[in-house]
């Protein structure tokens, strides 16, 4: 099962949290969900060059709080905060509630699966050899402290007539272990030969390490032995 399902979705509530946190009545749930999808599409389109890793949406008391995780926060903020103000106005038109935007910097983009996948996709679009792009990404990720990395690319690799899948892995990637902190993301490279899909798994360690076995209690002296 761990080899087939999305590693992030399988670990929600265990080692991962939801990216949308809010409560809605049954009649309003679909509208709220559709608003979230529209906001995410808007942000991904507007912030295409800002290396956005993750977008969190919260709705506390008739307000909206959006947390954008990015490796290039300066691009989002803009000169004197002009870009973020324009972004807030656009999101307000979608959500119809006051919006508060927070930018959090991703300090190690090499350990973020989304940023690694997008970086590989950009290299493939620039016609870099896929094996070189995969190997370089794996080495950079392991150098930053990851315990294991797996990268898979699928499509007409190198302009081949028949599409195929190639993958490269170093270290451990225990997909069946629920306590394993595994980041997973996908990206698409639009090449002249067609679309090439990129998948990245990064194993950062175990979140809930098993507790060491309790030491056996020393035998207590009996009254007869004391006498």
Swiss-Prot record:
- What family name appears in the similarity comment? Belongs to the universal ribosomal protein uS3 family.
Q: What is this protein called?
A: Small ribosomal subunit protein uS3
Q: Which gene encodes it?
A: rpsC
Q: Name one GO biological process term.
A: translation
The Gene Ontology CC terms held by the record are: cytosolic small ribosomal subunit
Parts forming coiled coils: none
Q: Which organism is it from?
A: Coxiella burnetii (strain RSA 493 / Nine Mile phase I)
Q: Which InterPro entries match?
A: KH_dom, KH_dom-like_a/b, KH_dom_type_2, KH_sf_prok-type, Ribosomal_S3_C_sf, Ribosomal_uS3_bac-typ, Ribosomal_uS3_C, Ribosomal_uS3_CS
Asked if the Swiss-Prot or TrEMBL record annotates the protein with the keyword Ribonucleoprotein, the reply is: yes
Q: Whom does it interact with, and what assembly results?
A: Part of the 30S ribosomal subunit. Forms a tight complex with proteins S10 and S14.
Question: SMART domains from the entry?
Answer: KH (SM00322)
């Amino acid at each position: 099962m761990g080899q087939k399902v999305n590693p992030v979705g399988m670990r929600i509530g265990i080692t991962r949290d939801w990216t949308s946190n809010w409560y809605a009545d049954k009649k309003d749930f679909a509208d709220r969900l559709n608003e979230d999808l529209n906001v995410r599409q808007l942000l991904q389109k507007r912030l295409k060059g800002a290396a956005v890793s993750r977008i969190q949406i919260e709705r506390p008391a008739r307000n909206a709080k959006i947390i954008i995780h990015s490796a290039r926060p300066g691009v989002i903020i803009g000169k004197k905060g002009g870009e973020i103000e324009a972004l807030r106005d656009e999101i307000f038109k979608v959500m119809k509630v006051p919006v508060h935007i927070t930018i959090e910097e991703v300090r190690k983009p090499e350990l973020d699966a989304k940023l690694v996948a997008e970086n590989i996709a950009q290299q493939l679009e620039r016609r870099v050899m896929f094996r070189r792009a995969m190997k370089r990404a794996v080495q950079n990720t392991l150098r930053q402290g990851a315990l294991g990395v797996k990268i898979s690319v699928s499509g007409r690799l190198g302009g081949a007539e028949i599409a195929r899948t190639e993958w490269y892995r170093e270290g451990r990637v225990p997909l069946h272990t629920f306590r394993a902190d595994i980041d997973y993301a996908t990206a698409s490279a639009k090449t002249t030969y067609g679309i090439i899909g990129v998948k990245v798994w990064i194993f950062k360690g175990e979140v809930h390490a098993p507790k060491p076995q309790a030491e056996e209690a020393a035998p207590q002296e009996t009254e007869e032995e004391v006498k």
